[in-house]
């Protein structure tokens, strides 16, 4: 299957899953912010399709390492925004993000082949697209759009865009039972992960969310060891330790920053 077709089936099963859950819980999928959903879906589908393509063209570790540059771009984004506003940049969280990325490199051990330059650029493009998508999620969170609704429209519109891309490229294939099971699992777990990610970026601290996103790599290693009898070298263990330290440091630093902001706001109210 081509990358667009994989996105189509992932989106299809995701939309069906959310529709059933919302119907059973008495929620609603009606929205007043359809334009924002279109923008978010375009960014998301483009990102996933390019990621699937790049993954098929280059070394897995290198591809994933480049994808995880999104938190670095986000940290740079926050530094620039802080400078423009005349505020202090969140350096403690930025340092934690850089530390986490070093851990990612130690675990993934990226290496760029001579024929992987273009796929590498595509991966960096995906990282930037993801950054734009996260900002779009934050905007929709400010509009009080629930995370399940954001993901539902991402799946529905993604299904449409992916169907067009599939017809224009490889065409559709009929999967066998094993393929259906794999696609169903991919759609279900991707949707659950997407809902959690959307909620964290839409309603939480974006820098902290991006740093904690590094934890997916240690979990992947743990699954590889427990389910597929993979081995872990000392360098990877050290990298996983750095990722753990980075996540905890970012959480503590964010909590302190939020406490200072609350204290400053309280003091401002008392003096006014």
What feature does the model see in each segment?
Residues 19, 41, 45-49, 71-76, ...:
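Hydrophobic/small/kink-forming positions within alpha-helical transmembrane segments
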Residues 32-43, 87-100, 119-124, 144-156, ...:
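Cytoplasmic-side transmembrane-helix entry/capping segments in multi-pass membrane proteins
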Residues 70-94, 218-237:
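C-terminal transmembrane-helix exit sites in multi-pass transporters
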